Amino acid sequence: MSDRHLYGSDHSYLSSKPSCSSCRRQSSTSQKNECMTNPGSIVLTQRWTVCNFESLLKLSRPGSCLRSTVFKDDAVPDACWQLCLYPGGKREENANNVSLFLKMSATSPSKEVVLKAEYRFYFLDDNDEPKFSNVNVGEFHAKPPKGGHSWGLRNIPTQKVQNSIRQDKSLVISCHIELIPDASKVPCKRVPITPSIEMPFAQIPRAHVESELEMLASGDGTDMTIVAGPLDGEREQFRVHAYKLRAHSDVFQMMLSHTEMRENQEKRIEILDFSPTSVRAMVEFIYAGVIKSDIDVYQAVDVMQIAEKYQILALKMTCEQHLLDRLNVNNVLECITHAERYNTDVLYDACVDFAIHNRQHVMALTSWRNFISDEPVLASNLLEKMVKSNDNSSPPVKKPRV
């Protein structure tokens, strides 16, 4: 756990009042407007084995062409690709050389296609290591009626190719193509804002944190026992000072200020509905203003719930920051649910923004259907925001003129 979590802010400067939907936190958030255009590259590869190439190299005449199978990518449906190999050279002037070309063809003979691509040729040895390589960039322009355009190498010295022939007399060619589809059709998307809670108080000195936790561990001068855990499960006792509990929780203050309360008479507080881990985190925070225990996302939710129950707002905000720092596609729906349940505005807004930006991945989760059935109001609100964001993310792309 980082020092930011271990040696956090002194919650004694922050009022621990009950939270509700109408309450607004005392923290400040840093807001900024940011967008991103991501024209992703498409990479195609073709591996082609030409058997008995040693004989082909000796006996092929100029103009004799071998062709690979046609390959394509569904993201570029208008174009397909093929390798063309001339063991004896493409023309008479290319004799004693090998010619290799990459051909792009339009999938529709009546359609004009223009693509700029980087293409790489490799001849691979028996260990699949490149013995020959070449990199070029070309603009492929296929237009009717021919419908195809080639770029490549006319004069690869025969000696270089011979050095690449494998022990089984074959030649293995690997071709890598990288291209970007029409970038003008790539929408610009708003970058989700994941705000950071800036605690409105000073940093706690490390020595103070350590001395407070040492006092808790020693049990010196304690006058109260907290028993945590269900009656039929794992339980743990914590020896604490009553004044610490009263100072940082309105609920404990009310409980321990009345002599007729059972907890005050028995000097014992039973917490049956939370695990010892969650109670330990709460007690550590009451003493030192930090959560020393290493807690995961699910435990942070439990600690946030116990902070809500005992009205320790600073602890609740610390858990909120813990969840913000670990927000991802797999837990965003669960975090939205908890943020709504415990009235954590910053976490809720960040989760919604994150879910909108990653809506395709979020809606593909197996938990998405459960979220719709279990939280229909939340799901409806989120879907509405997703639709509005999609409508406003980018102006409509103009259709090209025919």
From Swiss-Prot:
Q: Which cellular components does GO assign to this protein? A: cytoplasm; nucleus
Residue span(s) of domain MATH: 43-177
Bias class Low complexity marks the residues at 15-25
Instruction: Tell me how this protein assembles.
Output: Interacts with cul-3.
The regions listed as transmembrane in this protein's record are none
Task: Name the pathway.
Answer: Protein modification; protein ubiquitination
Region feature (Disordered): 1-25
Q: Which organism is it from?
A: Caenorhabditis elegans
Protein known as: BTB and MATH domain-containing protein 40
What's this chain's function?
Answer: Probable substrate-specific adapter of an E3 ubiquitin-protein ligase complex which mediates the ubiquitination and subsequent proteasomal degradation of target proteins.
Q: Which UniProt keywords apply?
A: Ubl conjugation pathway
What are the GO MF terms of this UniProt record? ubiquitin protein ligase binding
Query: The BTB domain covers which part of the protein?
Result: 222-295
Q: Which domain of life is it from?
A: Eukaryota
Name a biological process GO annotation.
regulation of proteolysis
Known InterPro entries for this protein? BTB/POZ_dom, MATH/TRAF_dom, SKP1/BTB/POZ_sf, TRAF-like
